Amino acid sequence: MNSPNESDGMSGREPSLEILPRTSLHSIPVTVEVKPVLPRAMPSSMGGGGGGSPSPVELRGALVGSVDPTLREQQLQQELLALKQQQQLQKQLLFAEFQKQHDHLTRQHEVQLQKHLKQQQEMLAAKQQQEMLAAKRQQELEQQRQREQQRQEELEKQRLEQQLLILRNKEKSKESAIASTEVKLRLQEFLLSKSKEPTPGGLNHSLPQHPKCWGAHHASLDQSSPPQSGPPGTPPSYKLPLPGPYDSRDDFPLRKTASEPNLKVRSRLKQKVAERRSSPLLRRKDGTVISTFKKRAVEITGAGPGASSVCNSAPGSGPSSPNSSHSTIAENGFTGSVPNIPTEMLPQHRALPLDSSPNQFSLYTSPSLPNISLGLQATVTVTNSHLTASPKLSTQQEAERQALQSLRQGGTLTGKFMSTSSIPGCLLGVALEGDGSPHGHASLLQHVLLLEQARQQSTLIAVPLHGQSPLVTGERVATSMRTVGKLPRHRPLSRTQSSPLPQSPQALQQLVMQQQHQQFLEKQKQQQLQLGKILTKTGELPRQPTTHPEETEEELTEQQEVLLGEGALTMPREGSTESESTQEDLEEEDEEDDGEEEEDCIQVKDEEGESGAEEGPDLEEPGAGYKKLFSDAQPLQPLQVYQAPLSLATVPHQALGRTQSSPAAPGGMKSPPDQPVKHLFTTGVVYDTFMLKHQCMCGNTHVHPEHAGRIQSIWSRLQETGLLSKCERIRGRKATLDEIQTVHSEYHTLLYGTSPLNRQKLDSKKLLGPISQKMYAVLPCGGIGVDSDTVWNEMHSSSAVRMAVGCLLELAFKVAAGELKNGFAIIRPPGHHAEESTAMGFCFFNSVAITAKLLQQKLNVGKVLIVDWDIHHGNGTQQAFYNDPSVLYISLHRYDNGNFFPGSGAPEEVGGGPGVGYNVNVAWTGGVDPPIGDVEYLTAFRTVVMPIAHEFSPDVVLVSAGFDAVEGHLSPLGGYSVTARCFGHLTRQLMTLAGGRVVLALEGGHDLTAICDASEACVSALLSVELQPLDEAVLQQKPNINAVATLEKVIEIQSKHWSCVQKFAAGLGRSLREAQAGETEEAETVSAMALLSVGAEQAQAAAAREHSPRPAEEPMEQEPAL
């Protein structure tokens, strides 16, 4: 009964019947075949004579008819039951077979897995064993290398010990050591300078070798300096010649007057150390050609035919002949070629008066220095032919070299060495003092022209950042000659214990000059006091420069001497001086130079000069943002020499004004009244190319989104569109460490605000410790960084981030002070992610937060509004002012419930302590489907930002202008579709606050086209240029559901602190056009209600006047007057 089609099923009451095929089902007999056997005893009913054989009886039909239907049904049921049982058995057999096969396959699979795992473990073990072997081999190689290195070191040490032993046991006739190349070069330079010392009698002003020509050694108050000696022809520093037929009775020691400023004790101690330095091979710090920086300056060698003798006028000598040009000494401290007299600058330089009469050019000398009016007549006069330009440039250069060399060696000049270069104003004071004789003028003018030539040559070749200043030229030349001549420098002579001066005409002349000089100092002091009062009244007193921690005490002393003693030509700008930036550049660009060498490189900048070599040619100083200290400086008249008799007793000394550093003005021009330079009241733009140096060492800008091309592209776009020409370009500077510490910790400031070469010097408290070099991670590109995207450049990043902060400070201070209308800072790296002690998200120092703090501290700005529309939340700015009620921080950023960088900025973060309610976060949620666009940002400004800002009423508005929400930025760094045009309109709305004092600072944004378009739109709005109108589709569009939900939540939270936003909750879903119409209708309704209320009040007042009874005390008209 096994059926091949056992899987078929049956429907109905007997499903098991389907197990059998239909053919078998039809073969089931309907009737039961019964083969009856008749009883044998039964006679045949039909027998008769049929032959006797019984015939079978046909009972089929009868039996069939007689079978019971019930029996048939039972039989069928039994058969069906049997079939069902057989089917169940078959099912059980099949299931048992399936289970058996499944178990078998499972066991096979487990065996295969175990085998595979065993193979993997064996392979892993083999790999680990190979790595262990490789590491072991590497370790063995390293150990072998170390052993080899140790052996080499031991061998080298043994060799050195052997050499030292040989040197110790050497004979006296042998050399003691083999000098290095540097020692050889310095020794050769020393020997050459010694060999070039002139022989006596070389020129007409040389001192004859006669024993009587050397005077006595005059002792000074400083008895610690030993007497100097030298070979023949080199006079000792304190032995003085008696020139010509001058009688030795008139020789008198020099006396120190009250007009000479005392030098700092520290400078004196350092000078004493320099004097005691005996070996010429040691490093000299008093020369200008020894230091690394000064090696770049021009070294003028070569001497004219017939070298002159060495300096014939030394301090302490009697009055010498005017024929020696080196004895021409001006009152302002220029000593010409006198190598043994340190220069000291008086606080005020002399300027030419407008009335150039001959009497006003009468010259006199300082009574503490040798006079030039005694002795023989000068053989050189100055004529117009001597001041004529040489036709050949090479001849003129050769003449200048010979002149300088001759002056270094103590000789004088002839007419052919004169130059036509204009004399700087700071040197004109030299020509106003000295002898009134024509020969005194000639000798003095030679010095002035020669010093100017040397300054110009050194300026053309020296490093641009540290150009030579006319105020320092005299000292540079003097120190240079001291280096070449190898004559020791000593301190200025002090008051001696000598007898009173003889009553000679020369002595009387010096007394008169001393009295006049004291009168001049008194007048000068009065002028300074009056000028200080004027500046204080007008509120334009310049700020004192804040010192950088990296400036040493010696550098500060040197700068004060330059600014006060020599008369600095410019006043420091806000919080910084040019000398500070120069000092920082020295530290960063030439780190091997020490502080003493950098002291000599202080630059006194011109007001019109560039900020440095790093600044592009199009960056110029648009005007002095902070007024000069001396407002009476005037253009100078050309220098003219008059031959006038000396009449010191009758000509009063005129107080001279401070001179400019520019050359003298052409003759005949009248000096216009000096007015303080003011900025145009327009938009200021600040940018500095030094910020371009902050980049990864790999140099691949495609890997790093925050690269230097961002600000370069924006600057180029503003130039191409002509917007830059309408703006005031502001010179940037580097922020000081003290300014940065207003927001950041000292540890963070030192770590990211200093370069590794000067970090240890500045870290006096040892805050960084030994781990300062281990704070950075190695990036996949090969560079280093704070994290995976915030790169760091050890050499340039510290200066670049400080420059970004300083640029924004300069711009914001000028806007807050009313010098500029508004401003846009093109700076990088950004800063709004930088927290107090954490650098992240391309940010190191929070420029906007530092600016807000300093505006409040230094300019007393009351309330500051910071609007941050960067797509990333400004977690650093929020942290800085979270508890400050004077700074309102409003941020519009993508939040996505904390799933977007940096994850902060929830709407519930409203501030803490007294600053509750002064932190507003418009945190967009819902992702980028649909993206947030113009409609949503404009709606947020209409309903949240501007109402709260107007109620806050800030004094200054700072904007963290990140443009990564502009369309074109992909989702990881953006994802929104705000147009660049929209940011222009947002800027225009912010300009209605704080009287228009709005400063935008570039933050994020990495698509160059997008940030250029947005920057152009913002600058156009700041300049009040007509903006492109928004599309009508934008005005008709309604904000999306996610934005409406975000704004509803923000209004719900902020309405507890700002009641002005509550009325906008109902109209968040309206389009801009509908909102404008509603606001217009509301305004008209309010106006109508106001008119109705006024009319009703007037009617009520009139009715009250009509019905009110007349007071009893008021008499009626008909009543007679009493």
UniProtKB/Swiss-Prot annotation:
Q: Where is the composition biased (Basic and acidic residues)?
A: 247-258, 272-281, 1104-1113
User: What EC identifiers does the entry list?
Assistant: 3.5.1.98
Sites where N6-acetyllysine occurs are at K533
| Alphabetic keyword roster | Acetylation, Chromatin regulator, Cytoplasm, Hydrolase, Isopeptide bond, Metal-binding, Nucleus, Phosphoprotein, Repressor, Transcription, Transcription regulation, Ubl conjugation, Zinc
Chain intervals with Low complexity compositional bias: 312-327, 494-504
Q: Which residues form the active site?
A: H833
- Per the Swiss-Prot or TrEMBL annotation, the motif Nuclear export signal is positioned at 1081-1122
Positions of the UniProt region annotated as Histone deacetylase: 684-1028
Q: Which InterPro entries match?
A: HDAC4/5/7/9, His_deacetylse, His_deacetylse_dom, His_deacetylse_dom_sf, Hist_deacetylase_Gln_rich_N, Ureohydrolase_dom_sf
Task: Note the SS bond partners.
Answer: none
User: What's the domain of life for this entry?
Assistant: Eukaryota
The Gene Ontology biological process terms listed for this entry are:
B cell activation; B cell differentiation; cellular response to insulin stimulus; cellular response to lipopolysaccharide; epigenetic regulation of gene expression; inflammatory response; negative regulation of cell migration involved in sprouting angiogenesis; negative regulation of DNA-templated transcription
Look at the named UniProt entry and state the broad enzyme category this protein falls under.
hydrolase
| Chain intervals with Acidic residues compositional bias | 581-621
Its job: Responsible for the deacetylation of lysine residues on the N-terminal part of the core histones (H2A, H2B, H3 and H4). Histone deacetylation gives a tag for epigenetic repression and plays an important role in transcriptional regulation, cell cycle progression and developmental events. Histone deacetylases act via the formation of large multiprotein complexes. Involved in muscle maturation by repressing transcription of myocyte enhancer MEF2C. During muscle differentiation, it shuttles into the cytoplasm, allowing the expression of myocyte enhancer factors.
The Swiss-Prot or TrEMBL record describes its family as follows:
Belongs to the histone deacetylase family. HD type 2 subfamily.
Name the chain's protein. Histone deacetylase 5
